[in-house]
UniProtKB/Swiss-Prot annotation:
Name recorded for this polypeptide: Spermatid-specific protein S1
Keyword DNA-binding among UniProt keywords: yes
GO biological process terms, semicolon-separated: cell differentiation; spermatogenesis
Keyword hit for Protein biosynthesis: no
Keyword tags: Chromosome, Developmental protein, Differentiation, DNA-binding, Nucleosome core, Nucleus, Spermatogenesis
Subcellular location: Nucleus; Chromosome
Record's GO cellular component terms: nucleosome; nucleus
Lineage: superkingdom: Eukaryota
MF annotations from Gene Ontology: DNA binding
Amino acid sequence: TKSRYRNRRSRPRRRYGRRMRKTRCRRKGRRISRRPRHTTYRRRVRKIVHLKRRSRPRDEIDNLKVKNNRRLNESLKQHRLPMRVPV
C-alpha cells in the first residue's frame, strides 16, 4: 500500500480549477473534443479523445498529405510572380 504521508521532498504540483485538471495529461498530437458535458455525467462519460494521426492507416495519411500539398500549392500560386514579364 502507498504510504499515507507523501514524500516531503517532492512538492505537489498545484493546479487550480477545472481547466487545469482537464489539460493535465493531454499529450501531443491528441485533441480532446470541446463538447460541454453536464456535471452529473462527468464521472460516467469519458472524454472523447480524437485519434492521433499516426494511428491511422497508411493510405489515409498519404491521402491527407496529398490533400494538404494541393492546398498549399494553390495558395502559393496566388502569390507567385509571373515568370515572363511581357515586354
